[in-house]
């Protein structure tokens, strides 16, 4: 599965004409890279003066929040959900209930990834004032990478025809993410 591939193998598999890994996996791996970049910035905010100022406690809290394994697992969950979707398209005898459950899972994976990216971005943004000033760019890279992953996961969610309330909730998160990015880029 995706989580066991090295970067070169994953990129080659993503570029190949095959159903998985696909866009959902790309979003998940991008989110993991973003979370890792932000976690690294937090790891460098553990100096003696950071401990004395309380910045190290903020860094430790951020590291505890950023679960790269969880976002990487979304890559495999996306592949499994897509395989089930393909099966549902081919199985004429499948019950309506089973098809609905498969479709719900296929939607839930990217929705959860957008939500997680949003949560992580808010956590990194809250950490920025405490971040070691020599490495804030890496924390910001984390935000931007997570933002891209959230937008990519949103596109995957849209393919799965979310209800309007889910779509609007995701759009609200993306708008908030966009506002954060614009502030970081000094575009706002």
PLM regions with names:
Residues 22, 26, 52-55, 67, ...:
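Residue-level recognition of alpha-helical structural elements
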Residues 78-154:
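Amphipathic alpha-helical interface segments
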Residues 50-90:
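A structural-propensity feature for long, helix-poor, extended segments
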Residues 2-21:
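Short, hydrophobic/aliphatic alpha-helical segments
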Residues 29-33, 67-74, 106-116, 120, ...:
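Amphipathic alpha-helix face/heptad-repeat signature
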Residues 37-56:
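Phosphate-handling active-site elements
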Residues 16-39, 134-153:
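Conserved phosphate/anionic-ligand binding catalytic regions in large, soluble enzymes, centered on
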């Amino acid at each position: 599965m995706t989580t066991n591939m090295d970067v070169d193998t994953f990129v080659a598999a993503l570029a190949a004409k095959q159903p998985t890994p696909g866009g959902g996996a790309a979003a998940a791996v991008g989110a993991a890279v973003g979370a890792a970049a932000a976690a690294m910035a937090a790891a460098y905010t553990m100096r003696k003066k950071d401990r004395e100022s309380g910045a190290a406690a903020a860094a430790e809290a951020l590291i505890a929040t950023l679960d790269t394994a969880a976002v990487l697992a979304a890559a495999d969950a996306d592949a499994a959900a897509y395989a089930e979707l393909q099966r549902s398209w081919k199985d004429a005898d499948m019950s309506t209930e089973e098809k609905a459950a498969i479709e719900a899972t296929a939607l839930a994976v990217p929705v959860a990834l957008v939500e997680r990216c949003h949560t992580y971005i808010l956590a990194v943004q809250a950490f920025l004032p405490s971040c070691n000033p020599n490495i804030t760019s890496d924390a910001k890279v984390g935000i931007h990478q997570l933002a891209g992953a959230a937008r990519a996961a949103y596109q995957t969610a849209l393919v799965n025809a979310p209800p309007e309330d889910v779509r609007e909730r995701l759009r609200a998160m993306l708008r908030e993410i966009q506002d954060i990015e614009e502030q970081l880029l000094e575009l706002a």
